Regions:
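Membrane-interface catalytic loops of GT-C/OST-like multi-pass glycosylation enzymes that act
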Residues: 7-10, 107-112, 169-181
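Hydrophobic transmembrane alpha-helices of multi-pass, membrane-embedded glycosylation machinery
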Residues: 12-24, 35-41, 134-136, 180-187
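Hydrophobic transmembrane alpha-helices and their immediate junctions
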Residues: 19, 121-162
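Transmembrane alpha-helices of multi-pass inner-membrane enzymes
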Residues: 32-36, 148, 154, 158-168, ...
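Long extracytoplasmic/lumenal interhelical loops at the membrane interface
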Residues: 57-72, 76, 80, 84-121, ...
Length: 207
C-alpha cells in the first residue's frame, strides 16, 4: 500500500520486475497467477492509480517528456566528460548541467542511475558498477544450486533486478536509504558466496 501511494511508476515497475524475476527463478508456475492478477488489477485499483499506470510510456505525460529532455542533456554532457566525469555529488552535476540545459528544464540529477554514475565518475565508474552487478548476478545464480540458500539467493537477485530497473527511470541513489539497500544486497550476496566457498573447502578436507 505504501508503494502504491508513492505514485512512483518507476518503483511500481521495479517491484513488478522483482516479483517476475523471483517467480521465474524459483516458482515459474506463479507467473500465470501474476499475469491473471495483473489483468484483474484494474477492477480493484482506484482510477487515480490506473491513470498513472496508463501514462507509463506516454510522451504526452509531462513527467515523461521532462525526463527525456534531461536524458538528452545528460548524454551531451557524457559526450564531453566521458573519461573523467564532472565530479562527485549533485553540486558538480548542477554546475555543469546549466551549460547543457534544454528549454529551461532544470534538474538536480540525471533522473537515471546509469547516466548519473557515468556523469559523476566517467566511463571507469559506470564500468565498475556494471562489473559489480555482473558479479552479483553470477554469485546469485551459482548459489541457486544450493538447497540451503537458493531462495535467499533468488530473493537477493530479484531485489537487485528491481532496483536496477527502477534506476532506468530515476536516480534512485538520491536517497541514502536506497543506496544502503543496494549495498545490503551485495553484502548478503558476498556472505552467501563466502559461506558456499567455506563449505566447499571443508568438504574437500573431509574427503
Amino acid at each position: 500500500l505504501c508503494l502504491v501511494l508513492t505514485f512512483s511508476r518507476g518503483a511500481w515497475l521495479g517491484l513488478a520486475v522483482s516479483v517476475f524475476v523471483f517467480a521465474l527463478l524459483k516458482e515459474p508456475r506463479l507467473i500465470v497467477l501474476i499475469v491473471i492478477l495483473a489483468l484483474l488489477a484494474p477492477m480493484f485499483l482506484p482510477p487515480v492509480v490506473m491513470n498513472r499506470i496508463a501514462s507509463i510510456g506516454s510522451l504526452e505525460d509531462s513527467s515523461n517528456a521532462y525526463r527525456i529532455t534531461i536524458w538528452i542533456a545528460a548524454l551531451r554532457m557524457i559526450k564531453d566528460y566521458w573519461l573523467t566525469g564532472v565530479g562527485l555529488g549533485l553540486s558538480a552535476f548542477a554546475r555543469v548541467y546549466r551549460e547543457y540545459m534544454i528549454a529551461g528544464a532544470s534538474a538536480i540529477h540525471a533522473h537515471n542511475l546509469y547516466l548519473e554514475i557515468c556523469l559523476e565518475l566517467g566511463v571507469v565508474g559506470i564500468l565498475s558498477l556494471l562489473w559489480m552487478v555482473f558479479r552479483a548476478f553470477s554469485e546469485a545464480l551459482s548459489n541457486m544450486k544450493s538447497d540451503k540458500s537458493s531462495y535467499l539467493a533468488a530473493g537477493i537477485l530479484a531485489g537487485i533486478a528491481g532496483h536496477l530497473f527502477h534506476g532506468l527511470f530515476d536516480y534512485v541513489w538520491y536517497s541514502p536509504r536506497i543506496v544502503m539497500a543496494f549495498w545490503m544486497y551485495l553484502g548478503l550476496m558476498s556472505a552467501l558466496a563466502w559461506g558456499s566457498y567455506t563449505e566447499k573447502v571443508a568438504g574437500e578436507k573431509l574427503t
